[in-house]
């Protein structure tokens, strides 16, 4: 391959790899393994308020993890609004069917400010580690709607990417607004 792929080319390649991965039947087992590593991390262990997400097809399955940990920590999930992401407290009785039938918090779920979050884990289409000779730098490529691009700068806590191994790439094209992540569980 010559030159760097565009973001759209990477998204198309990931979509094809996602179809193959989902057909393999490994999504649930791999999700449990990845989230097991996340929950053993000191960043998660010390956090009282944790921002997660409800998975869409091809992402690490998080719903049972969030439900289980909501008994011990304040778990938040985003609500997509026209202006971006609102952080809402996870409460099983405040979930409604959202985009593609994915559960999301209703507007009645308690709202949380970004500065209240102690730890966040986020999905992505692709991730890269240590590109351009910067070891430890973790970059994320999203779906192209910039929801997390607008949210991440307002979080003042460790932010981890969670993804299946096929989503790790050598390089991602970066924009000035891209923010590196602190951790990656893959």
Name what the model sees in each region:
Residues 85-186:
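Conserved phosphate- and dinucleotide-binding cores of soluble alpha/beta proteins
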Residues 2-115:
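N-terminal active-site beta-alpha-beta segment that forms phosphate/nucleotide-binding
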């Amino acid at each position: 391959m010559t030159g760097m792929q565009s973001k759209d080319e990477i998204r198309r390649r990931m979509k094809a790899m996602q179809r193959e991965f989902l057909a393999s039947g490994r999504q649930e087992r791999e999700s449990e393994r990845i989230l097991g590593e996340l929950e053993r991390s000191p960043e998660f262990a010390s956090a009282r308020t944790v921002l997660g997400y409800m998975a869409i097809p091809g992402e690490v399955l998080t719903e049972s993890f969030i439900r289980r940990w909501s008994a011990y920590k304040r778990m938040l999930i985003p609500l997509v609004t026209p202006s971006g992401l609102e952080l809402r407290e996870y409460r099983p009785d405040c979930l409604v069917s959202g985009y593609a039938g994915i559960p999301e918090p209703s507007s009645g779920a308690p709202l949380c400010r970004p500065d209240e979050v102690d730890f966040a884990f986020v999905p992505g289409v692709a991730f890269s580690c240590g590109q351009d000779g910067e070891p430890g730098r973790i970059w994320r490529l999203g779906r192209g709607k910039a929801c997390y691009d607008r949210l991440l700068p307002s979080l003042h806590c460790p932010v981890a990417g969670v993804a299946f191994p096929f989503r790790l790439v050598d390089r991602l094209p970066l924009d000035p607004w891209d923010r590196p992540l602190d951790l990656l569980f893959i």
